């Protein structure tokens, strides 16, 4: 019996211990569950924003049934900084936002006004018309209006005067003036210097003005021509002119070589004025975009001509989407006018496209919110912090990465006078030294002559100066006198 009682007591004790252990484990599991709920509580209580956007590469794209792109990364960074959750929806009508014929706003702006979305995170341009109905944050991207072209449709045609292209018109004008001035200085110095003739009253000087022009032209061709200078003053001018022509020809050959080697990279359409003047390409923009209304409201005559062209051919030249515009540029003779930053992306993705140099209408992409929304200022401060930390630059480089191998050659342009400023200055100094040397030579001769004829040096110098500057008249008078004597 004792053994039986001990056995029963052991069984009861074991059952009680197991029951307490099970109850304690259950208590611990309930506590853990309660703790997990507390951790999820703050996440579940985060404000949820409905975000409207538009599908445009590289801002928002659909890949593997998920959205990604520049704006999605930006939205994630803002949500992390401001502690909110979000739901992203693509705008129903596929438009950015403009006033329709019935006075209502379309696109993402319309969805915010109808309270279908809280904010719009997209390449949405900040304009005065949109600012009147919604609020914008600080721009997260800066852009402008540019011209997207196809390279092979814009190869520059050679003209008969293409050889003049290495220098600008101002440079050619300066060179012509320098040539005439140098030849005149040669002519003047040769007449003043006593070393260029023995008897100026009886002998004609070899450096006439026509001969001086011929001498200067021969130096331009790197050819030695007569007359040969004998005086130091004339040789100074001749030497400085030779150095000038050598440097000038080197600059011309280098720039002309760069012009020929650049080939099709030289765009005849550099500006919007060039676009209006040409007749080879059609041009247009996105229908209802801020770019279209920029030209409509502009007072610039060139911009008005662009608007009138697009408005008259609205059904033919205006496109519905950015992807359609890029494809049309690649497939036909069409130039697309739009956001320069988007055109840079197209040129990076498609190596046969290029953006014209001129960019007008500086503007920015901002996040749109409802007016008086408490999120406007918060988002603006967050965007500024992302810019200051370099995160916006990182996103820009990440999504605008190019697959093209661009040559590191700079775009060619005609040589301007400023580039040859030092060369012109050297020539001017040489001409001045030559004239001074000629005056010194004539002064020395006048001083020696004054000692023989018992006259002042100044009077002799003046007589010599007048005689040499009127030598042709004196020679003609002497010839007429000799002719009368023979008669």
UniProtKB/Swiss-Prot annotation:
Q: Does the keyword DNA damage apply?
A: no
List locations, semicolon-separated: Cell membrane; Postsynaptic cell membrane
List all topological domains (Extracellular).
24-169, 257-419
The signal peptide stretch is 1-23
TM region(s), chain numbering: 170-190, 236-256, 420-440
Sorted keywords for this record are:
Cell membrane, Glycoprotein, Ion channel, Ion transport, Ligand-gated ion channel, Membrane, Postsynaptic cell membrane, Receptor, Signal, Synapse, Transmembrane, Transmembrane helix, Transport
One GO CC annotation:
postsynaptic membrane
Residue ranges in the Cytoplasmic topological domain are 191-235, 441-487
| CDD domains, per database record | PBP2_iGluR_non_NMDA_like (cd13685)
Q: Where does this chain mainly localize?
A: membrane
Glycosylation site list? 104
SUPFAM superfamilies hit by this protein: Periplasmic binding protein-like II, Voltage-gated potassium channels
Q: Which InterPro entries match?
A: Glu/Gly-bd, Iono_Glu_rcpt_met, Ionotropic_Glu_rcpt, Iontro_rcpt_C
Membrane topology is:
Multi-pass membrane protein
Q: Which SMART domains match?
A: Lig_chan-Glu_bd (SM00918), PBPe (SM00079)
Query: Would you identify the family this protein belongs to, as annotated?
Result: Belongs to the glutamate-gated ion channel (TC 1.A.10.1) family.
Q: Would you tell me the protein name for this molecule?
A: Probable glutamate receptor
From which source organism is this entry? Anas platyrhynchos (Mallard)
